[in-house]
Amino acid sequence: MVGNNTAYNTNAPKSVGPWRSTNKLVKIMNDSFYDLPCPVNLNAWWSFGSMLGLCLVIQLLSGLLLSAHYTAHEDMAFDSVVHIMRNVEKGWMLRNIHANGSSMFFICIYAHIARGLYYGSYLDKTVWYFGVHLFLLTMAEAFLGYTLPWGQMSYWGATVITNMLSVSPVVGESMLRYVWGGWTVCNATLKRFYTLHFLLPFVMVAVVFLHLFFLHEKGSNNPLGIESGTMCVPFHPFYTIKDLFGYVCFSFFFMYLVCVDPELLGNHLNYWPANPMKTPIHVQPEWYFMFAYAILRSIPHKAGGVYVMFLSIVVLYLIPTLHTGKYRSLCFYPLNQVVFWVLVGSFISLTWIGARPVREPYIILGSAFQLFISLVYCWTPFLYGCEMNYLNTLNFV
C-alpha cells in the first residue's frame, strides 16, 4: 500500500522533460522542426525546401504592405505603382523585394523539383502530389501578380495567356468572357486578378502545411534513397546551421537583385502604361515561364500548342509511375543520370529560346528541345529496365 500512495500524490510532477516537449501546443512545432529526426547524409540540395518557406514569408509580408498602397483600377494601377516607387517611404525597396522575390521563389522551386527528380523523392506520392499542387498554385499566383502593374507587357501578357482558355471545347469562349468580365481584358479583369492574387497565398500556406504534414509522417528522403530510420539526427542544431548558411547565401544574391540590379530579371516594357491600341513586337512572360512559352510557340496549331504546354507541366503528376527501378536515387543509374541532365539542359535551353524573337532558328530549336523532353519521359522506364538487368548480371541486386 505504501508503494501505491505515490500514484495519488497530487504534488508529484506530472511531466518530465524539456518545456518544448511537454507543452501541447509547442510540442507540435518542436516535433516538426526542433527535434525532427532527419537522415544524417542530407546535402545542400535539401536546403532549398526551407528557402522556399523563407520566400513565401517574404512574399506574404511584402505583398500585404504593397496592397496598402496599390489601386486595382485600370486608370490608376500603373500610377499607384509609380507612387509606391517615388513617394512611399522605402517603397522602391518594397516593390523590388516583391518583384525579385518571385524570381527567387522560382529559382528555389525549380532546384527543389530537380532534387526530387534526381533523388527519387517523388516515390513518396502524397508528398509529391501536394508539391505539384503547390507548383501549379505558384505559377497561377505569379501570372496574376504579373498583370497587376498594368504596364504594356502586363496587359498584353494577360491578353495572350487568358486567350488560351478559348481552346477548351464547348465552354472555352464562355470561360474567356467570364474571366475577362467583358469582351476584352479590362478593369473587371484587373479586379478579378487582384482579388485572386490576394487570396491564393493563403491557400498556398494551407497546402504547405499539408505538404509538411505528410513529409514528416514518413520522414525525409536522402541522397542514397535508402531507409534511414535508425540513422537519424535531430533537425537542430545539425540542419538549422545548414539552413542558416543557405539563408545567408540566398540573402547575398537577393539583396544584389533588390539594391543593385533590380531589373536584371524584369522586362523594361512594363515601364510603359498599358496601351490596348499598340501591340508590342514581342509579347513574352517572365523568365520563369519562358520554357512553357517556347513550347507553346514551337507548335503552329494553337490548341495543340496549349495542350502540349499544359502537359509539359502536369506530367509531373505521372513521374512516380515512370519509376520502375529497385532503387530510388539516380546515383545507382548512370544512364538515367545522363537522361536527367538532358532534361535539365533542355529546360534551360527552352528558357533561353523563349526570350528570343519568334523566327528561325529559334522556332525549330524550340520544337527540337520539346521533342527531347517528350522522349525523356518515354525512355525513362525502358532505361530503368536495362540498368536493372545489367545490375542483375553483376549480382548487385
UniProtKB/Swiss-Prot annotation:
GO terms for biological process, alphabetical: mitochondrial electron transport, ubiquinol to cytochrome c
Textual note on the cofactor: Binds 2 heme b groups non-covalently.
Entry binding sites for a ubiquinone: 216
Cofactor: heme b
Residues involved in heme b b562 binding: 98, 197
Keyword Electron transport: yes
Binding site for heme b b566: 112, 211
Alphabetical keyword list: Electron transport, Heme, Iron, Membrane, Metal-binding, Mitochondrion, Mitochondrion inner membrane, Respiratory chain, Transmembrane, Transmembrane helix, Transport, Ubiquinone
Spans traversing the lipid bilayer: 48-68, 92-113, 128-148, 193-213, 241-261, 303-323, 335-355, 362-382
One GO MF term: metal ion binding
Subunit structure: The main subunits of complex b-c1 are: cytochrome b, cytochrome c1 and the Rieske protein.
Other remarks in the entry: Heme 1 (or BL or b562) is low-potential and absorbs at about 562 nm, and heme 2 (or BH or b566) is high-potential and absorbs at about 566 nm.
Family: Belongs to the cytochrome b family.
Record function comment: Component of the ubiquinol-cytochrome c reductase complex (complex III or cytochrome b-c1 complex) that is part of the mitochondrial respiratory chain. The b-c1 complex mediates electron transfer from ubiquinol to cytochrome c. Contributes to the generation of a proton gradient across the mitochondrial membrane that is then used for ATP synthesis.
PANTHER family given in the database record: CYTOCHROME B
Protein name, as recorded: Cytochrome b
Organism: Mytilus edulis
